[in-house]
Amino acid sequence: MAGLSIWHVVIFAIVVILLFGTSKLKNIGKDVGGAVRDFKKSVREEDEAASLNSPRTIDAQAKTSESTSVKS
């Protein structure tokens, strides 16, 4: 059987905890979370910078006012 049962996952988790310890796993989790947060922040900043630099078109009718008299 190629699938993982719940017992495989439980045994794997116990082995990982025994090897690394809970404090080490917590630090690894913090580091991975910080890396993901920084990556999302940089992607968001690039998207905002790209949207500010992209050319924009304005769809509007030009209005002209004609004045025939000139005041001096």
From Swiss-Prot:
Its main location: membrane. It comes from the Bacteria. GO terms for cellular component: TAT protein transport complex. Coiled coil: none annotated. The keyword S-adenosyl-L-methionine does not apply. It is a single-pass membrane protein. It is found in: Cell inner membrane. Keywords: Cell inner membrane, Cell membrane, Membrane, Protein transport, Translocation, Transmembrane, Transmembrane helix, Transport. Residues 47-72 are annotated as: Disordered. The keyword Zinc does not apply. One of its GO terms (biological process) is protein transport by the Tat complex. GO terms for molecular function: protein transmembrane transporter activity. Residues 51-72 have a biased composition (Polar residues). Pfam families: TatA_B_E. The chain crosses the membrane at residues 1-21. Belongs to the TatA/E family. The Tat system comprises two distinct complexes: a TatABC complex, containing multiple copies of TatA, TatB and TatC subunits, and a separate TatA complex, containing only TatA subunits. Substrates initially bind to the TatABC complex, which probably triggers association of the separate TatA complex to form the active translocon. Part of the twin-arginine translocation (Tat) system that transports large folded proteins containing a characteristic twin-arginine motif in their signal peptide across membranes. TatA could form the protein-conducting channel of the Tat system. This is Sec-independent protein translocase protein TatA. The gene is tatA.
